[in-house]
Amino acid sequence: MVNTEVYIVSAVRTPMGSFGGSFASLPATKLGSIAIKGALERVNIKPSDVDEVFMGNVVSANLGQNPARQCALGAGLPRSIVCTTVNKVCASGMKATILGAQTIMTGNAEIVVAGGTESMSNAPYYAPKNRFGAKYGNVELVDGLLRDGLSDAYDGLPMGNAAELCAEEHSIDRASQDAFAISSYKRAQNAQATKAFEQEIVPVEVPVGRGKPNKLVTEDEEPKNLNEDKLKSVRAVFKSNGTVTAANASTLNDGASALVLMSAAKVKELGLKPLAKIIGWGEAAQDPERFTTSPSLAIPKALKHAGIEASQVDYYEINEAFSVVAVANTKILGLDPERVNINGGGVAMGHPLGSSGSRIICTLAYILAQKDAKIGVAAVCNGGGGASSIVIERV
């Protein structure tokens, strides 16, 4: 078995569009194509040089067969390209990256594109009783986004109920969650103001129609929407007298991200300067209703796999499905909050489900470069009780 080192030679993401916002007219497959094309162009790699593509996507209904392949062909990759769509809910993009790394490590590929894409704005409604005709009574529409993206498959409850359970079990009050959310927004706003995201973002042209020029979207839409007074006063959503609100949870969004992974031999052959090396990963799972704290189980596994001590880690990216997720996992692992999500996260920037896992790897790689740091850990929880984590090293 081959066991080559795997490098990230390119990492990009689209801006994240608000729900029903600038990207509402673009399907997830189009956003994915833009990310893949942008990632390849950054390092001047020909589409025909790519061996395989893994792309995460969660709500695939109405997108057509194998969204990953549509993303690849839309980016100009040849029809011979092997493509796999990955659905591990919010961890899909990270799992796609892990699969890509494993494919290279086993000698089955030298160049892999991995990432994820989601258009939550375009998630359809289902009419499940209409296949053979409703026999009697009213016909209901089922929200595909809620059913397949944001609800527990086992008890049918929204993900926010699990967030409330997390807050209760780990004694995290409303004020702490609101404070974290405000911090996330301010960090994201600062990152935009200082152009910290500039390197990782590939702009997206959106057709406007009626003879008007296309609109060029270059930054995330959500961070500017902070209203501190409103955030602190909005009512809890999932539980009477609860602590989780629409304002301290992640938003619904559209976006995509893509990484170009490469074997050590191919990096040397092409004379490229990688962004980072993938040195380990780990995954974990527990009760579905406790998925919120699964990153605290996956991160130690990833560190062990990488042969890294927690004290060696410079920065963390823990996906902010809810403020309570980042707060709880930071608390459980005893992390320094000043080294977690330093440019904001899903609460302020957005959480397009299939993309977030690879998006945080992308962001982390640039943080390591900007901060002249060495080791970074990214982790993301996923519905059903799981989490994935990955360790990267700047080279």
Swiss-Prot record:
Acetyl-CoA acetyltransferase; part of the first module of ergosterol biosynthesis pathway that includes the early steps of the pathway, conserved across all eukaryotes, and which results in the formation of mevalonate from acetyl-coenzyme A (acetyl-CoA). Erg10 catalyzes the formation of acetoacetyl-CoA from acetyl-CoA. The first module starts with the action of the cytosolic acetyl-CoA acetyltransferase eg10 that catalyzes the formation of acetoacetyl-CoA. The hydroxymethylglutaryl-CoA synthases erg13 then condenses acetyl-CoA with acetoacetyl-CoA to form HMG-CoA. One of its GO terms (biological process) is ergosterol biosynthetic process. PANTHER family: ACETYL-COA ACETYLTRANSFERASE, ACETYL-COA C-ACYLTRANSFERASE. Pathway: Metabolic intermediate biosynthesis; (R)-mevalonate biosynthesis; (R)-mevalonate from acetyl-CoA: step 1/3. Belongs to the thiolase-like superfamily. Thiolase family. K(+) binds at residues 185, 246-247, 249, 347. CDD domains: thiolase. Its EC number is 2.3.1.9. It comes from the Eukaryota. The active site is at residues 90, 351, 381. Homotetramer. This is Acetyl-CoA acetyltransferase. It is an enzyme of class 2 (transferase). It comes from Schizosaccharomyces pombe (strain 972 / ATCC 24843).
